[in-house]
């Protein structure tokens, strides 16, 4: 029983830490997306190029 209890607390702390990290990641991603959206609206001519570059960068990072 003690052994099970220990593993349970361990997994719980791990999940908590993971969740916190994920939240910050999502927040930064959302902010970045908002910025890119604004930039896209302004520059219509360079839309394809900027989009391609941004998607490539995002895929590599995340």
Curated annotation (Swiss-Prot):
Q: In which tissues is it expressed?
A: Testis.
Give the location in the cell.
Nucleus; Chromosome
Q: Which InterPro entries match?
A: Protamine_P1
User: Where in this protein does the record put region Disordered?
Assistant: 1-62
Q: Keywords in UniProt for this one?
A: Chromosome, Developmental protein, Differentiation, DNA condensation, DNA-binding, Nucleosome core, Nucleus, Spermatogenesis
Q: What is its main location?
A: nucleus
This protein's GO CC annotations: nucleosome; nucleus
Coiled-coil parts of chain: none
User: GO molecular function terms here?
Assistant: DNA binding
Q: Does the keyword ATP-binding apply?
A: no
Query: Tell me, which GO biological process terms does this entry list?
Result: chromosome condensation; sperm DNA condensation
**KW NAD (keyword) present:** no
In which family does this protein belong, per the annotation? Belongs to the protamine P1 family.
Function, in words: Protamines substitute for histones in the chromatin of sperm during the haploid phase of spermatogenesis. They compact sperm DNA into a highly condensed, stable and inactive complex.
Provide the protein name. Answer: Sperm protamine P1
């Amino acid at each position: 029983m003690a052994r099970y209890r220990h593993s349970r607390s361990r997994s719980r702390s791990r999940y908590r830490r993971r969740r916190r990290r994920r939240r910050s990641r999502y927040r930064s991603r959302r902010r970045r997306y908002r910025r890119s959206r604004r930039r896209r609206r302004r520059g219509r001519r360079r839309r394809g190029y900027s989009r391609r570059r941004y998607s490539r960068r995002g895929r590599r990072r995340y």
